[in-house]
């Protein structure tokens, strides 16, 4: 059996001790990916080598959604490449699509550090990043000089912290107009727990003007989705679905991180010495899996399977992917699982999907 250099050699070093800063490690990895994103012969060759190592291509994995071709149904979730510095690299790791951002109209530093915490025994992460990003103009500049992507690229839009809730629609609109030519689909993020008041925008009276404003400016028409929180009640989700259908949105991303902390094994966060319950922020990873899947199933049932769903939350194994697809997800996304398992996870998941497809295909 071949040794995975990330999982068996690099990851134990990165995750060892209490000195490792998860955010610094993320920045270093993203800087490397940004360098690989250059339109230079060496970088192109290295991307090709990564693709041979990590990617898996098979016609049975392909999906057609919103008129876009997805080489496979597994994408990179928003939050990893906030500024769009590595657009052409994500396909080399095997992703079938990538969602950039969250990006805001105004550049902003995010919340004070520390703001990213690993809960190893739970295979989870708590983050309170606060939409730290260089702004929509900087993302546009990065994408305009980047080599083209071979997979669909989504862009996740958030509200700037300095923008009052009453002016949220104008803030989203400014980013949407600037980035519209550069994304294949767009996601309205009103569900992060780390921007004060943002989740209030999920209420009907707050959300409707945002959806109306963005759809009115959506020319030529591109898929516009909404990302929702897992902590909503079924009644709240049903009300959101009414708006999604009324304003003809293309789909739902389910779900964002949770503010719940029930059932965690981790007692203390090493960086702060406090318990997970005492740390503000959104929880992602394995503890979110069941709730995210339940939300996907509810949306699928409420819409009779007519609304495409991107399922995200707690994917670590092929069975996790299959569970979300069976619940009604059209596509799925990774974030925390990829951090813990490393780049080889994509290939494992895709092999698992193919194995499941083989089992479903009757012998001739």
From Swiss-Prot:
Q: Name one GO biological process term.
A: 'de novo' UMP biosynthetic process
Q: What Pfam families does this protein's entry cite?
A: DHO_dh
Q: Which Gene3D superfamilies match?
A: Aldolase class I
Which compartments is it annotated to reside in? Cell membrane
Question: Keywords, A to Z?
Answer: Cell membrane, Flavoprotein, FMN, Membrane, Oxidoreductase, Pyrimidine biosynthesis
Active site residues of this protein: 192 (nucleophile)
The record's similarity note reads: Belongs to the dihydroorotate dehydrogenase family. Type 2 subfamily.
Q: What does this protein do?
A: Catalyzes the conversion of dihydroorotate to orotate with quinone as electron acceptor.
Protein name, as recorded: Dihydroorotate dehydrogenase (quinone)
Q: Which organism is it from?
A: Thermosynechococcus vestitus (strain NIES-2133 / IAM M-273 / BP-1)
């Amino acid at each position: 059996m071949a040794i995975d250099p990330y999982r068996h050699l690099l990851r134990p070093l990165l995750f060892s001790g209490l000195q490792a800063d998860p955010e610094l490690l993320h920045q270093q990895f993203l800087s490397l990916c940004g360098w690989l994103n250059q339109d230079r012969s060496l970088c192109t060759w290295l991307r090709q080598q990564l693709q041979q190592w990590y990617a898996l291509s098979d016609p049975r994995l392909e999906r057609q959604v919103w008129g876009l071709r997805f080489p496979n149904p597994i994408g990179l979730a928003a939050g990893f490449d906030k500024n769009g510095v590595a657009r052409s690299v994500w396909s080399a790791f095997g992703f079938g699509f990538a969602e950039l951002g969250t990006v805001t109209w105004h550049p902003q530093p995010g919340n004070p550090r520390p703001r990213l915490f690993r809960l190893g025994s739970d295979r989870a992460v708590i983050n309170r990043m606060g939409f730290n990003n260089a702004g929509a103009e900087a993302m546009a500049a990065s994408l305009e000089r980047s080599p083209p992507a071979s997979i669909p690229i989504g862009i996740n839009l958030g509200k700037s912290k300095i923008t009052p809730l009453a002016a949220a629609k104008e803030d989203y609109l400014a980013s949407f107009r600037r980035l519209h030519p550069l994304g294949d689909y767009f996601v309205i993020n009103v569900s992060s727990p780390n921007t004060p008041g943002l989740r209030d925008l999920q209420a009907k009276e707050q959300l409707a003007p945002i959806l109306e404003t963005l759809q009115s400016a959506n020319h030529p028409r591109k898929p516009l989705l909404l990302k929702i929180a897992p902590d909503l009640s079924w009644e709240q989700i049903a009300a959101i679905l009414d708006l999604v259908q009324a304003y003809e949105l293309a789909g739902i991303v389910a779900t964002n991180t949770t503010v719940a902390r029930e059932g965690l094994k981790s007692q203390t966060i090493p960086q702060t010495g406090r318990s997970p319950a005492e740390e503000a922020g959104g929880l992602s990873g394995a503890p979110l899996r069941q709730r995210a899947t339940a939300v996907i199933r509810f949306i699928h049932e409420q819409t009779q399977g007519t609304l495409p769903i991107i399922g995200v939350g707690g994917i670590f194994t092929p069975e996790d992917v299959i569970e979300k697809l069976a619940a009604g997800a059209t596509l799925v996304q990774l974030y925390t699982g990829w951090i813990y398992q490393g780049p080889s996870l994509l290939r494992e998941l895709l092999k698992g999907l193919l194995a499941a497809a083989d089992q479903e295909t009757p012998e001739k």
